[in-house]
Amino acid sequence: MTATITDINAHEILDSRANPTLEVRVTLSSQAYGCAAVPSGASTGEREAVELRDNDLERYGGKGVLQAVENVNGPIRDALLGQDPRSQEEIDRIMIELDGTENKANLGANAILGVSLAVAYAAANNADLPLYRYLGGDGGPFSMPVPMMNIINGGAHATNNLDFQEFMIVPVGAPTFAEALRYGAEVFHALKKRLVSRGLMSAVGDEGGFAPDLPNNEAAFELILEAIEDANYVPGKDIYLALDAASSELYQNGRYDFENNQLTSEEMIDRLTEWTKKYPVISIEDGLSENDWAGWKLLTERLENKVQLVGDDIFVTNPDILEKGIKKNIANAILVKLNQIGTLTETLATVGLAKSNKYGVIISHRSGETEDTTIADLAVATDARQIKTGSLCRSDRVAKYNRLLQIERELNDQAPYAGKEAFLFNRK
């Protein structure tokens, strides 16, 4: 007998920034159930699906999500009772139609996503499968993703003087995911020692990376290279560098406010190009603003065969916007964030579109996270080959890494570590 949805319940919980978010539980007639919690971003793309907040300044500074909870426990629950949880596309379609807007502004993308993911977990649990096998099929193909580890935070993720948001290490040369995690942890500790020895702040930002004040953004690269060598690894062989410029946050009146200079798109591209020549940079995310499509085209023409160019704010995990970008030859990879689009079905469609056009895929967390580990399973299920889930501290980040360790043990030889094969920019 087919199990059907018998109950859906949402409630407020706290995310890693002490802001409310939703946790949703979907229960089936078989008594199997699934739970999921929804993340939240700090630097958000203008075209992201709408995260519904209460705006009641008497509660949580206006950031409560009681209305989104009510939407789950009321109209969404009523619409989905009796549905087969295996019918993910149909369930997501029902919620999208019930909302009735292009950006999920009525019910809230946070409400819809929580239900969408909890339904998938319920179906997986009912089939006695881990989520990655339920979504990816029993035979895969599976691979363990290369982690992009954010070890120096700046921009909107910290209160320091760095313009760029994330300076990351990418342990491409490791033989397994477990070893990649070890490489990253050892560099993290080496970097902390460097910071302490120089009297620099070793407190961490939203995503667990250190947030020191430095003379300039380039000094972050220099510090990280020193830490890599201190940990006895070789930059550009064992470990590469990656950057999230989050340039939409710097873009005003057609210029980029960078290190107290007002740079044109061409000047920003020149700066990024110079760094790719000077440092072992393998990936640049949001090198230009989401509203600077002409600049993005120039950036792609300049660097598409030399480095991974990741579109986050410009694509917002939206398959329609990604398709437009592919046609215009914008970027060569996409950052995938579940809550930017708001359903599992649309997320999987975006991943499929990217992969069919040889765009790199990086499954990503948000700066406001919970202990939910969905993105770890999603990265393996979709054979995305890259994951971005923060630094090597803070339980909200480490939970994803530990889940990936568990998956690697379960799959063993079925899921080789992607390594350099994860990067498609020189094979398009």
From Swiss-Prot:
<feature type="binding site">
    <location>
        <position position="165"/>
    </location>
    <ligand>
        <name>(2R)-2-phosphoglycerate</name>
    </ligand>
</feature>
<dbReference type="GO" id="GO:0006096">
    <property type="term" value="P:glycolytic process"/>
</dbReference>
<comment type="pathway">
    <text>Carbohydrate degradation; glycolysis; pyruvate from D-glyceraldehyde 3-phosphate: step 4/5.</text>
</comment>
<comment type="function">
    <text>Catalyzes the reversible conversion of 2-phosphoglycerate (2-PG) into phosphoenolpyruvate (PEP). It is essential for the degradation of carbohydrates via glycolysis.</text>
</comment>
<keyword id="KW-0324">Glycolysis</keyword>
<dbReference type="GO" id="GO:0009986">
    <property type="term" value="C:cell surface"/>
</dbReference>
<comment type="similarity">
    <text>Belongs to the enolase family.</text>
</comment>
<dbReference type="InterPro" id="IPR036849">
    <property type="entry name" value="Enolase-like_C_sf"/>
</dbReference>
<dbReference type="GO" id="GO:0004634">
    <property type="term" value="F:phosphopyruvate hydratase activity"/>
</dbReference>
<feature type="binding site">
    <location>
        <position position="312"/>
    </location>
    <ligand>
        <name>Mg(2+)</name>
    </ligand>
</feature>
<dbReference type="GO" id="GO:0000015">
    <property type="term" value="C:phosphopyruvate hydratase complex"/>
</dbReference>
<dbReference type="GO" id="GO:0000287">
    <property type="term" value="F:magnesium ion binding"/>
</dbReference>
<feature type="binding site">
    <location>
        <position position="337"/>
    </location>
    <ligand>
        <name>(2R)-2-phosphoglycerate</name>
    </ligand>
</feature>
<dbReference type="Pfam" id="PF00113">
    <property type="entry name" value="Enolase_C"/>
</dbReference>
<keyword id="KW-0963">Cytoplasm</keyword>
<comment type="subunit">
    <text>Homodimer. Component of the RNA degradosome, a multiprotein complex involved in RNA processing and mRNA degradation.</text>
</comment>
<dbReference type="InterPro" id="IPR020810">
    <property type="entry name" value="Enolase_C"/>
</dbReference>
<feature type="binding site">
    <location>
        <position position="366"/>
    </location>
    <ligand>
        <name>(2R)-2-phosphoglycerate</name>
    </ligand>
</feature>
<dbReference type="GO" id="GO:0005576">
    <property type="term" value="C:extracellular region"/>
</dbReference>
<keyword id="KW-0456">Lyase</keyword>
<keyword id="KW-0479">Metal-binding</keyword>
<feature type="binding site">
    <location>
        <position position="244"/>
    </location>
    <ligand>
        <name>Mg(2+)</name>
    </ligand>
</feature>
<keyword id="KW-0964">Secreted</keyword>
<dbReference type="InterPro" id="IPR029017">
    <property type="entry name" value="Enolase-like_N"/>
</dbReference>
<protein>
    <recommendedName>
        <fullName>Enolase</fullName>
        <ecNumber>4.2.1.11</ecNumber>
    </recommendedName>
</protein>
<feature type="binding site">
    <location>
        <position position="388"/>
    </location>
    <ligand>
        <name>(2R)-2-phosphoglycerate</name>
    </ligand>
</feature>
<feature type="binding site">
    <location>
        <position position="367"/>
    </location>
    <ligand>
        <name>(2R)-2-phosphoglycerate</name>
    </ligand>
</feature>
<dbReference type="InterPro" id="IPR000941">
    <property type="entry name" value="Enolase"/>
</dbReference>
<dbReference type="InterPro" id="IPR020809">
    <property type="entry name" value="Enolase_CS"/>
</dbReference>
<feature type="binding site">
    <location>
        <position position="285"/>
    </location>
    <ligand>
        <name>Mg(2+)</name>
    </ligand>
</feature>
<feature type="active site" description="Proton acceptor">
    <location>
        <position position="337"/>
    </location>
</feature>
<keyword id="KW-0460">Magnesium</keyword>
<dbReference type="Pfam" id="PF03952">
    <property type="entry name" value="Enolase_N"/>
</dbReference>
<feature type="active site" description="Proton donor">
    <location>
        <position position="207"/>
    </location>
</feature>
<dbReference type="InterPro" id="IPR020811">
    <property type="entry name" value="Enolase_N"/>
</dbReference>
